[in-house]
């Protein structure tokens, strides 16, 4: 009321001169009325872009130039209101209906509007375009509301939190051409009446919770140009054959929505279709030859299904094809030669099938290929010379085949090349000149082949611009020295040259590679000295020089590497004493000095006391370990040194005690000050009026109801990120309330957290715990989630919940949790890295369906807590942490993949990540590898003994996926999208 009175006086003060002169024109009155409506709208906003400061009553004469406002030239009525991307939060005032009937365009997309869509919106009878996408609107869309909006042409409600059934009144809108209801929580079936749209060209219902069959009636909308029905809907049945009647269709997307059955041959009637997405379903049968009639097709993706048979030759009619994806199916036969003759083909991905024969000899000759992935098949023969004919090739992946012969020399001049993975083949010949030094190459894998010759020296000097981060040439027959030009690979992080025939002195130039994380030069013929320049590789964490002929001593400069945790120099010819300085490397947890000619005594300092006896065996002149103790005089001198150190330590302790005592008195005084401040803030915190509640869907409770849950007797869990309480709202809804660790007061991170929570609140996926609301004041942040009655996977597997998970339930949990992570990694923009994937963060619903929880919060714990706490928050939990974190202190989505692999091993074995595995210091990953020898058939040795009648093929496949996920090198791990694909295909017969 006060706001309205204030607005009235503003209007009065601005027009009082006009009143006095009796000169108010109808035009001015209209402008004032419309300005008043916009001011009412602005007052309902909680926050907005500063550009909306132009909206003020004294400025009413320039109403039509206000931000986002457009008018007609005749009577200055507002016809368009565009408030998109203005950082607006809050609600929409009912006053908006007063802009009818002149308003024809309303766009409020990409903001943070919340609450229900006001019914007054439906009163905008002249509206032609309504775009409310990418907000946080909730509740149901009125069944009859849209029937008033008879002029509507475009309705875009994508990416909100609407729920309930799809609104039926939309079918009465005869002018409607564009309808997007995707990215919401609509449930139930698609109404058959949706087939009665008269003018519809664009229909998207993807990304909801729709069930049932796709109605055949949709085929009656023959005006359709684009149709999107996939992504996380869960349909029964298959693709309606009647869709072959949608002759105007250009884009058909039915991906990832549980479709079964065969691909209808009738789809071949869609002559205008340019994009067909059917990937990630459960489609069976063969690829219909009739698809070759879709002569306009540019994109065909049938990947991650259960398709069988051969690639039909009739697909040669797809002369406009640019993307051809058939990967992760059960296809066999040869790759037809016509594939290499498709003139516009850019992306070809046929990996993980059973293709045999040769790669088409002319592949790449069209000059347009950008990406080729034919890995994990049974291909033989030579690699075609023409792959990079057009100098556009960026990705070449052919690993795990039976290819032989030389590498095409032309690949050494393929400058766009970014990823090059040809390991696990039978390739011979030398490395093409220039290949290692290509300017854009990031990953080079040629391990496990029969390559010969020397590693080429860079002649042109272009390597200084190299992007190469990983080289794997291990297990070949390469010979000669490492070229000095390796110093120019400044971005190199991983250098794997083990199991070759390389010789000569290891070049000191390697010390200039400051980004190196791992070096493996074991099992070669290197001689000469250990280069002291290695000590300049300050990021190095792994160094293996074993099984060579290196002599001299280990340079003390190595001790400068503060994060080195693995050092292996065994089976060489080192012949001097072990440097004491190595003992001061607290990071060094594993070292092997065995089978050399080291002399003297083993240092007793620092880390040397932790190394096993086997680390020193085979050194006849070395004493000081259990198998070869030193003589008495040596022991006596060591004892005297120890006494001197103890005396020095006592003096240091005395000085430190005085310092700490003084600091303690100061701290005691500060405690009283802090307690007084805390007491004052607690009094303020208990006032619900200071709390702000942001809902991400329709809420049946208020902030005071949430605060009632935050009591000690409601605690159901405590962790590194806060305390979790269970609560029951007035409407009977059960919720979980997470109280986050206290954020630094006045920190600039507060706004960052609030903004991130807004992003997390918009995430919608059936396998992700739904964030219902965010409740906060200046001191405390509370997250309100849907409650999961069966607790966490960790509690069920390892706790005392009294629940035993059958194998089929475990496999289903694995698949559903993978889908949740896949959504975070691949379908969120920007992608979200979980940062703490573990079994305790996978919650189980009433039917034991998996929901990923606690995602996206760790980086705020990093920002707002001390360094000691942030380490665990960022990296994850003990037993789940990817090995590269130890030396990079950075994580990415592949870190999540590693952690998920650990969860899979928990599901298979029923054991904790860190358990009693019979040997100190090993975890579930190491134990599983030891027990099975990394062989999938060995899964029977580690399977949970409580399980019976397990499908052997399923267990083997799930273990295979787990082993891929926990690969030591992150680049070798699959993406979560690939993990979903592999687990989806794991279900097989044959039990044991």
Swiss-Prot record:
Induction statement: Accumulates upon CLE45 peptide application. Accumulation is promoted by CRN, especially at later stages of protophloem development.
Record topological domains on the Cytoplasmic side: 678-992
Impact reported for residue 901 to E: Insensitivity to root growth inhibition mediated by CLE45 peptide
Catalyzed reaction equations: L-seryl-[protein] + ATP = O-phospho-L-seryl-[protein] + ADP + H(+); L-threonyl-[protein] + ATP = O-phospho-L-threonyl-[protein] + ADP + H(+)
Molecular function GO labels: ATP binding; identical protein binding; peptide binding; peptide receptor activity; protein serine kinase activity; protein serine/threonine kinase activity
A Gene Ontology cellular-component term: plasma membrane
Tissue spec. comment: Expressed in seedlings, roots, leaves, stems, inflorescences, flowers and siliques. In roots, confined to protophloem and sieve element precursor cells.
Disruption phenotype: When associated with BAM1 and BAM2 disruptions, loss of stem cells at the shoot and flower meristems. The disruption of BAM3 restores root protophloem and mersitem phenotypes observed in brx mutants. The bam3 mutant resists to root growth inhibition mediated by CLE45 peptide ligand.
Secretion signal, residue range per the UniProt entry: 1-21
Positions bearing carbohydrate: 28, 75, 87, 131, 163, 220, 256, 293, 354, 440, 472, 525, 568, 575, 597, 613, 631, 635
InterPro entries with a match to the protein in the record: Kinase-like_dom_sf (IPR011009), Leu-rich_rpt (IPR001611), Leu-rich_rpt_typical-subtyp (IPR003591), LRR_dom_sf (IPR032675), LRR_N_plant-typ (IPR013210), Prot_kinase_dom (IPR000719), Ser/Thr_kinase_AS (IPR008271)
Protein name: Leucine-rich repeat receptor-like serine/threonine-protein kinase BAM3
Organism encoding this protein: Arabidopsis thaliana
Lineage of the organism: Eukaryota, Viridiplantae, Streptophyta, Embryophyta, Tracheophyta
